[in-house]
């Protein structure tokens, strides 16, 4: 039986939200009374998908919708390339989602990687006889952190293993007719979007300072590319705080696109720049631990009248697996109400460890009960028994021990402890309850000049940390990637 609230984030299913060939084009278009159309894009490159998800058919699309649209008698008609879907669109509650979550489901689509490319899906929203129900995408679509009218959709294969999530938003309104008709005004925005995983146990959201820095970086690059293409600029790309959202940052400019050759050169230059923009949007590296399991997308948004630049690129971090931890246990993030912060920091060491020693501190946080992923390995009130790091045996002598700081309690020092030689495992026993763990920290004392990044294995300059609730059969050991 499905447990209500067991999967708090869309698509409210246990599937891979970042791996798949199908996504919505960044912009939807209106088409007559209460009808809205979305274009499907197919991308089978390594940044979009791996393995079977790259070739799977598109069986079903589910949209994240507002439960207020689930009104008796209200309905949605769906077509693909002008033909009604084989099975009618249905509005339904999400059984595993939080209270109030709902989806619009289009199933048995029968599309593949060839027939889905540029296929157009149109939705006609109808009220009941009493005029109740949703008639606009502002009312229908639920996309927290995005501008109103943005729709979030998941594309499923038949087995519902692959479910890449993407967004489509409103096009910018046409500009007022103040520019002479001999010119071609191009109102273009660059949208940098982070798409959280379905199980978002370490949520990362853009703050105002990060947004301003990313907007400035993108603006500088776009203005330089416009100059290099010898294109006349009406309004340079520039930061705008009103275009900063939790999971999306938009940077806009306006230029003359009447010279088709110059516009073609600009298009090629911006296409080559998209990977750099993804790096900017992800803090320098898409494998930044803060964005573990996230997808980063950079795309253009144009005005309705003229699609001057139509570009998009997505990336996720796919690192090779590591032989850690050295046991058989449940490594799924979120199966315990404890997490390790994606960043560590350095501080002066406890005097016990002597001179020329630095401590590298990892903060522990806790989840709400509704965020914990159901499993057989965790029982209510299980303690945070220990933390293990994937660390090189070659640096055993450099690790002096631990200083641990339970929340609300006194700190204490603990001697270093390692697994058997060859397992490359550094560990510390804690036995913390939820109160002690929420904001508690564990600091590893390391002899200079070595650093935490030196002793950790797996990802260059980063660490894999695994947390445990016990050491006997059927236990939890979720793995979290961390960095400086």
From Swiss-Prot:
Pfam families associated with the record: DUF3707 (PF12499)
Major location category of this protein: secreted
Swiss-Prot/TrEMBL keywords: Extracellular matrix, Glycoprotein, Secreted
Source species, domain of life: Eukaryota
Annotated compartments: Secreted, Extracellular space, Extracellular matrix
Induction summary: By sexual inducer glycoprotein.
Example of a GO cellular component annotation carried by this entry: extracellular region
Keyword NADP recorded: no
Glycosylation sites: 16, 240, 256, 265, 326, 330, 356, 411
Family matches, as InterPro entries: Pherophorin
Membrane-spanning intervals of the chain: none
Role this protein plays: May be involved in conversion of asexual males and females to the sexual pathway.
Protein's name in the database: Perphorin-2
Native species: Volvox carteri (Green alga)
